[in-house]
């Protein structure tokens, strides 16, 4: 088979990088929001996991949830409510639909989360698998938060980090 060129080519372990030609940013506020999560390591070994939402027009950080456990689907639903209330006050349903762009993490793609999003007027959208650049705005925010806030502020324990998060996000905005 080798002599006749019939063997399959060996896999070298690297993946072909997915090229993203789409556009995350939009020209008007409240058209598309993006969300992602990150982990902050504390000096004492604790980890704080944070999920956040940004407007894809003005990049405003509109809401966040933080926990020392894993981010759950319920946390993401709470984030959706907090984000909607941040922009529009207490409403049951958005007047016009807004896209909610996220990766394919289990809390985001959970059936209850997607149904809840549609019930309040959000349109859940996910990025292609293995394509973090498709949610580049959220990925850039993660890098900014870690570089400009986490690295230069004390992070002795989870409680301190969780208490500082609102101040960091206010300063970012």
Residue map of PLM features:
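Charged DNA-binding/catalytic regions of mobile-element recombinases
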Residues: 1-173
